[in-house]
Design a protein with these regions (language model features):
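Bacterial N-terminal signal peptides that target proteins for export
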Residues: 1-11
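Hydrophobic helical h-region of N-terminal Sec-dependent signal peptides
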Residues: 12-16
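C-terminal motif of bacterial Sec signal peptides marking the signal peptidase cleavage site
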Residues: 18-22
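Bacterial signal peptide processing site
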Residues: 24-26
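Post-signal peptide N-terminal segment of mature Sec-exported envelope proteins
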Residues: 31-64
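Active-site-proximal alpha-helix that buttresses catalytic centers in soluble enzyme cores
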Residues: 55-159, 164-167, 210-243
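Generic beta-sheet signal
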Residues: 82, 190-199
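All-alpha RGS (Regulator of G-protein Signaling) helical domain and cognate RGS-like helical scaffolds
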Residues: 160-171, 178, 185
């Protein structure tokens, strides 16, 4: 599905979630309370996306799924894939990598209530569709490991998925992020399992040239066992239940 179609579908879904919450006047009762703000910003990504498409954003918009629907589901049920999620929706979308303390959630962007629901919806879809999950790896940022925990009930933090603490990256810093994350993308999962990674936009772009947008988007990769991988599909949070 094209990025334009996915964006339209995402915002329709967000509108439904907000509307239902308002009608039901529900109060979240999770063990760790999600943030109350529901702001969705159209500008400014974690790495500072602008009004015009960058090369990475254009690559995301132009990406064509190699497998979709029942074919994709069947492939995932057999295992052997790495599924890289950009964390679920946050309160606001801005770059926080310079000042954020990964050990203190109050210094970071945090998941909104929509983000919490997105993560839970993803996890329910994986269970309902019987998509086997082995390792679940997240960055050390709260929005990443909370997405992983809400969706899959487990995670191991890995600093190789963290941002480098700079507002604007040099070519050398982008290369360093690529060197950090690539081993996770090319590692073949255990037989019959899929590896889930929950990270960030710039990290994925450094290794693939694709800026994963919007938040909550996932890319399905197939490691070939020879140090490379193939990009198979991208998925919005609500698309998993439709496979």
């Amino acid at each position: 599905m094209s990025k334009k179609s996915k964006i339209i579908e995402l915002f329709l879904t967000v509108g439904i979630v907000v509307g239902l919450g308002a009608c039901n006047n529900e109060v979240a009762t999770d063990e760790v309370s999600p943030a109350n703000a529901e702001e969705i910003s159209a500008e400014g990504g974690e790495g500072g996306e602008g009004e015009e498409y960058s090369e990475g954003e254009q690559a995301n918009a132009d990406f064509k799924d190699k497998l979709a629907g029942e074919e994709l589901l069947s492939a995932l049920q057999q295992g052997g894939h790495v599924i890289y999620f950009r964390h679920a929706q946050t309160e606001r979308d801005y770059a926080d990598q310079v000042k954020a303390d990964v050990n203190n959630c109050s210094t970071q962007r945090v998941l909104s209530e929509i983000g919490w629901q997105q993560a839970k919806t993803i996890g329910e879809a994986f269970q309902g569709k019987e998509i086997p999950v082995g390792k679940v790896i997240s960055s050390e940022y709260c929005r990443a490991w909370q997405t992983a925990d809400l969706a899959f009930g487990q995670y191991e933090k890995n600093s190789d998925l963290n941002f480098l603490p700079f507002e604007d990256y040099t070519d050398e810093q982008v290369a360093q992020m690529k060197e950090n994350v690539t081993p996770l993308l090319i590692e073949q999962p255990e037989s019959g399992e899929n590896t889930v990674i929950v990270g960030h936009d710039d990290i994925f772009e450094s290794a693939t040239g694709i800026y994963p947008d919007p938040q909550g988007m996932a890319y399905v990769l197939k490691p070939d066992g020879s140090g490379n991988f193939e990009l198979i599909a991208n998925m919005l949070p609500d698309e998993w239940s439709k496979l």
